[in-house]
Structures are given as C-alpha cells and as structure tokens.
Amino acid sequence: MSLTQSKEVNSLSRRYSTYIERRITRTVMVGDIAIGSDYPVRVQSMINEDTMDVDNSYLAIKRLHEVGCEIVRLTVPSLAHAKAVGDIKEKLIKNNIDTPLVADVHHNGMKIAMEVAKHVDKVRINPGLFVFEKSDPTRTEYTDTEFETIKKTILKRFTPLVEVLKSENKALRIGVNHGSLSERMLFTYGDTPLGMTESAMEFVKICDELDFHNIIISMKASRAPVMLAAYRMIADRLDAEGYNYPLHLGVTEAGDGDYGRIKSTAGIGTLLAEGLGDTIRVSLTEAPEKEIPVCYSILQSLGLRKTMVEYISCPSCGRTLFNLEEVVDKVRKATSHLTGLDIAIMGCIVNGPGEMADADYGYVGKGKGTIALYRRKEEIKRVPEDEGVDALIRLIKDDGKWIDP
C-alpha cells in the first residue's frame, strides 16, 4: 500500500469511527481547571450582572456553580469594575466556591486588563477592539508598512499584560468575534472566516514571540456556518504552523428558546464531532444557569462526557402497548439522579430489544398490560404494566446500583 493510500484509509477509518478522536491540544490551566485534549471538554458561562454589584454578581456565580458550570466570565468595562472583581473573588473564597473567573476586556482596555489580571484566572481580549483604528472612507489599500506599524503598536500595548499573565501563571483567551473585526482586517480580508483567522493569528504570533503559551482561542459568530468555517480554518492554520492551543467553542448571540439551543448545538456539536473544541459555552438570551444543561446534553449526546442518565426511548407508533410519554416521565422522575446509567423505555418488541441492547436496563411492552424488564440483553421478568416502574426500581436496587436521591 502506498503512503497516499495509507493516508486515505486512515482518513476513512476516522470518518466512519464511532469514537470521536479529539484534536491534540496542550494543557492550559484556568485556576484549578485544566483545559486541553487530555481532559474533558469544559463547560462555562457568563453572568449578566453589572460587576460593580458585588453581592448579585456573587449570587449569579454561585447559581452557576451549583448547576455544574466550571468557569465563569464577567464583563470588566472600567478600572472600577476591575477592582470590584477582587471583592467578588474574595466573597467566593470565603464561601468555599472555587470556580475560576475570566475577565472580559474590550476597547483599548490595557489598564483594565492589568488591574483585573490580579483577581482572575484568565483574561479575554478581543483582537478587533484592542487597538483603535479609525475608519478612513478614502482608503484604497493597507500597505505592508501600515500593517507592521499597527503590529508594533499592538506589541507595545500587549506586552505588559502578557508579562503579568506569565508571572502569575494565568491564561489568556484570544477571543475573535465575527462582528468586531478591526478596520484593517475588514479592509484586507473582508468580513470573512479568513479575516477572523488572520486576526487571531496575529495575536498568537505575538504571544509566541513573547514566549507565552497559556492561550485559548475562540472564533465566534452569530451564524453557525460562519462559525464552523472560522474554527476549521484556525485549527488547520494552528496545526500547520506548529501551534497546539485549545479552542473555546460558541455561537455568539444564539437567541433563546428551542431555536437558540438548536442553533448552538448545530455549531458546537458539529465541531465537537469533528474533534475540535476543548471548552464550550452555549450563549442564550436567558438566565445563564439555563445554558449549562444544554452544554452537558451536547457533550453527553456525543459521548464526550457522561453527567446524567442516558434515556433511550422510541418515538411511539401504532404498535406501542402503553402510554410511552407518561411512562418515560415516570421513569425519569424516579431515576434521574442515577448518573451513569443507560435506561431504555421501548413501546413494543419489534425494535425494542435490539435498539436497547447497549442499555443497562430496559422496559419494554410485551403484550397488552404486560411489561418485560431487561438487564442489558437478558429478559429478567415480566410484570403487569401498573407495576412496571416500581419493578424497574427494585431491579436496579437488587443489582446494587441504586442511590437514594
């Protein structure tokens, strides 16, 4: 077999694999949370409160912590806000909440970033807003000299922050947004994934020059196709140039309700399935704590993390022998705390036993008024329908897998 044929076979084997092979990335510590391909994909969010409101900011972080959020971001638009973050951090420590904090800094926020770096575990900057570039409607080109001049300005302003982050072993997110590319990136590359990639790479290379590698990169857009293209492009570019930095995935401004969740899943889930992504945020126009179950559901659906019971149930049809929706609800209410189990509830024997073969336990209609309970592929017993849920619980208890809620 030739080298080319071997590569094609390997590519096909990955394409048809039932296991997601993650892109190899370095480990970046954000507080005590390790981000990178050697660790689970992490879940994070951002609070809505004004950071100056220390008490309510603390409570918002506490709510996120309680639902499993691993990293929390705060907006820091001024020096006063930066100092308030210190008070928030102190209150978290006093209450034994160790969730790492990320400061979101924009618009020439060098002094702000320097101040807040003392109090947080990671600073997020937006390359498009780091150095103000005044729009010139008469411009016909950006010369190499102009690019180099602006790069030197960025280097001068950026270096002190990098040195602080290095000295305190803290992290940086280079957070590119499709909607806020710099004037010269827009002029040169357009409002495109390529413009986003060039924007990110400019800062990646500056960090490399400064020997700073605690970097995470994001390429967010409000349209999933743009976001998908940008993340694929930056991953290819990083790998081609020998950089193995982790990626933070997200569809920004995804909206709310079902559509916001579906839109986020279309973007984030697609990239995760391709092996890209080391930490994720689902951005909803809702209370931040509502984002966290969506994140964990995406990860569990792809087999990347298991943090809840996996329920397998058919959509129901004319062959269904009991009220499937009602029974699924009863089983879920009784067993949702048994993290790690797979439980299948199937309406009839046509597809039931085969479809649920990988489940730990099965609940299948076997005739009018009769339920069959399974342990993996083995039928254990048949019981009257009205005793089915209780009998399932007894079976789980008999196997020593029950935990009181």
Swiss-Prot record:
It catalyses: (2E)-4-hydroxy-3-methylbut-2-enyl diphosphate + 2 oxidized [2Fe-2S]-[ferredoxin] + H2O = 2-C-methyl-D-erythritol 2,4-cyclic diphosphate + 2 reduced [2Fe-2S]-[ferredoxin] + H(+). It comes from the Bacteria. Binds 1 [4Fe-4S] cluster. Gene3D superfamilies: Dihydropteroate synthase-like, Sulfite Reductase Hemoprotein, domain 1. Pathway: Isoprenoid biosynthesis; isopentenyl diphosphate biosynthesis via DXP pathway; isopentenyl diphosphate from 1-deoxy-D-xylulose 5-phosphate: step 5/6. Its EC number is 1.17.7.1. Keywords: 4Fe-4S, Iron, Iron-sulfur, Isoprene biosynthesis, Metal-binding, Oxidoreductase. Converts 2C-methyl-D-erythritol 2,4-cyclodiphosphate (ME-2,4cPP) into 1-hydroxy-2-methyl-2-(E)-butenyl 4-diphosphate. This is 4-hydroxy-3-methylbut-2-en-1-yl diphosphate synthase (ferredoxin).
